[in-house]
A protein has these predicted regions:
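Thiamine diphosphate
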Residues: 1-157
Length: 157
């Protein structure tokens, strides 16, 4: 699903100059591919989740369509921005989380936690989507870039 996500996002960014992607220390070598083609609209904050979401909020408030990408549980490192701005102020940031169910269960203790998606869903005002097919994923991405609300998109490994 991640490959399909990045392939389709690449296509969407080629058609819409208002779409940005913020990588949060994840996504190589796709980051390099995006940076080469969309240098001013591709950002990598490395392990700075709070910074990534703060940048996403600012870009979104200036009219840009912003995707962020990291491993799902890492979004909790930016909980303050998610709660105070993205959720409370309904800033339309599209948070994409890699890993669902047991995708990262063999990696380490902090990259996998079955409660993370459910906890993120509990934040008021952030609808969450769990596409299972490439058709569902592409359709949901097309819908999300047209919406003016925040969202979370879960991507299987």
């Amino acid at each position: 699903m991640r490959r399909i996500f990045f392939d389709y996002l690449y296509k969407l960014m080629g058609k819409n100059k208002d779409i940005y992607i913020i990588f949060v220390g994840l996504g190589y070598p796709r980051y390099k591919e995006f940076k080469k083609k969309f240098s001013t609209r591709t950002i990598n904050t490395e392990a700075a989740e709070q910074t990534a979401l703060d940048i996403a909020v600012g870009l979104s408030m200036s009219g840009k369509i912003v995707f962020t990408y990291t491993i799902t549980p890492f979004y909790w490192r930016a909980a303050e921005t998610i709660r105070n701005y993205i959720s409370h102020e309904q800033i339309p940031v599209i948070m994409c989380g890699a890993g669902r169910d047991n995708d990262y269960s063999k990696e380490d203790g902090y990259s996998h936690d079955a409660t993370d998606i459910q906890s993120l869903m509990a934040i008021k005002g952030i609808p969450c989507f769990f596409p299972d097919t490439k058709q569902e994923l592409r359709k949901k991405m097309r819908e999300l870039i047209k919406k003016t609300i925040p969202s979370f998109l879960s991507l299987r490994r």
